[in-house]
Amino acid sequence: EYTLPSDGMIIRQMEKKGKVNRRTWFALALMLLVVPLLLYLSVRFFHGRKYLICSLIVIVAAMLPFFMMFEGRKPKAREIMVISVLAAIGVAGRAAFFMVPSFKPVAAIVILTGVSFGGEAGFLVGCLIMMLSNMFMGQGPWTPWQMFSFGIIGFLAGILYQKGILKARKRDLCIYGFLSVVLIYGGIMNPAALFMSVYQ
């Protein structure tokens, strides 16, 4: 499943390049139907006050497709370790640059995780980075929305790479990073701010 080339990078050998399997479709349905519904119910009925419970439920929903990745094969320790380290680097990077406005090295790590390990891992790492880093930056009703936004960025990066649309080139990844942060993160967080202000 993994090879270690001379440059030391772990390269994921995609199962079937260009073909999205049933597990990925299940993950997509879970992430685009269940998680947004959960976020809406949290804002509508709890007025954003139960954000920690909602965040934990989003993490559990993100872990289900991730665990399904290992169905039928034995995961290697280095695979899980690298994913854990990527999440830790994202948390540390966000905390280190907290003084710099609108600059946090989160999207790059989430995108690289999605491209290298698949969309499910990208979604999980995006969720974990936002939830754990908000322990330092400040938790609030925005936390589940941030988790969902960066999770979708990582998941979509994995899908586009698997389909051959997104190439593992610096220019392509930078363009995707810019567009995904502006359109996906901004497109989710801006309406979320409106919902949170209306229902509080």
Predicted regions and their residues:
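N-terminal amphipathic/basic-hydrophobic helices that include classical n-h-c signal peptides
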Residues: E1-Q13
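Generic transmembrane alpha-helix motif of multi-pass integral membrane proteins
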Residues: P65-M68, V106-G122, L156, L160
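Hydrophobic alpha-helical transmembrane segments
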Residues: I80-V85, A108, F123-C127, P144-F148, ...
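Lipid-exposed faces of alpha-helical membrane segments in multi-pass integral membrane proteins
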Residues: L30, V34, V60, V85, ...
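Interfacial aromatic-anchored transmembrane helix boundaries in multi-pass membrane proteins
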Residues: A92-A107, C127-Y161
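Membrane-helix interface segments
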Residues: K76-E79, G119-L124, L166-D172
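Hydrophobic transmembrane alpha-helices
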Residues: E15-I111
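Membrane-embedded alpha-helical hairpins and interfacial helices in multi-pass inner-membrane proteins
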Residues: E15-L56, T143-P144, K163-Q200
